Amino acid sequence: MTIIVKKAWALSKGDKVAVVSLSGGMLGEDFCKHDIELGRKRLQEFGLEMVLMPNALKGIKYLKEHPEARASDLKAAFADCSIRGIICAIGGDDTYRLLPFLMNDAEFLKNVQENPKVFTGFSDSTVNHLMFYKLGLITYYGPNLINDLAELADEMLPYTKDAFKRYLEGGNIPAPIRSSDFWYEERTDFSPEAIGTNRIYHKEIHGYEWITCKSSFQGKLLGGCLDTLYDLLVKDGAEKEACNKYGLFPTEECWNGKILFIETSENHMKPEKLEKILLELDRRGVLEKINGMLVGKPQDEIFYEEYKSVYKKVLMKYPNLPVVYNVNFGHAYP
């Protein structure tokens, strides 16, 4: 099948948006019932209709044991022409297990090309984004349902809400993406009792930081969560085998002229592990080919300075590669 790069139309008021649990299944647990209603309410405020796919609420145990059910929901969403967007419920750690059920399904591959959708999610959804890149669909490493749309405060975080508006018709007007004035701590209480409470927040004192040279750069974005990339590229196991079998990671040529975006998860990987995955990306020719790099803010600013030191160390051999640190995307809030 000839792959043609496709970009979905922006979402319009009245559009249906599918919610899928492609990794972790917590959306189907009783302790997440309030997240469903909050997410539905927020989507309605954007003028969008939430469609829960058949297996999205089957819970952690069932979805862990049945990756084919998770894949089935994604296939059904692409087969349904009335669905215009797809939003991931949350991340996890085994999205790679869906690859055999998706990449070996000719009808799914055809639907991705013929029925492009706005697809958004982050973290372990990196696997989905890399898969869709291979299949020629432009996707968005952005908000998911539980973390962002179902924010327990009375409103979504303002910066995140503005970002989500860019998925809507008329919302994607070119404009500077500035550093958020504030950053927010991860919650420790996600229960219904926390509804209406605000996150602890701090004034942003760093803003965007240049790791290497300070110069303008441009290119198409490609990247994801470093924790997932580590499992796919460095750690020996089923994740790495699946990545190699399906050619998930882009070839060296694909990185030519790109902007690499990367960020770390809530697990706060040790700086030594960060260095390993960066060196692996370098070994694969990524750092030599790209035009620049965007690095996400570490959640809760844990290892903020240590990570910065690792980037400086690894990138010492690329003094002319512009790298911007502390960008608002991924696991940090906003």
Q: In which residue ranges do the predicted regions lie?
A:
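Structural motif
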Residues: 87, 120, 259-263, 294
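C-terminal active-site/capping subdomain that shapes the small-molecule cofactor and substrate pocket
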Residues: 264, 268-334
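Long, hydrophobic/aromatic-enriched structural stretches that serve as scaffold segments
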Residues: 78-103
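Oxyanion-binding "anion nests"
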Residues: 221-271
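ATP/NTP phosphate-donor binding region
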Residues: 1-82
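Charged helix-capping and loop-helix junction motifs
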Residues: 33-36, 67-71, 103-104, 274-280, ...
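Conserved anion/nucleotide-ligand pocket segment
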Residues: 138-227
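Short, acidic/small-residue loops that bind anionic groups at enzyme active sites
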Residues: 102-132, 138-146, 322
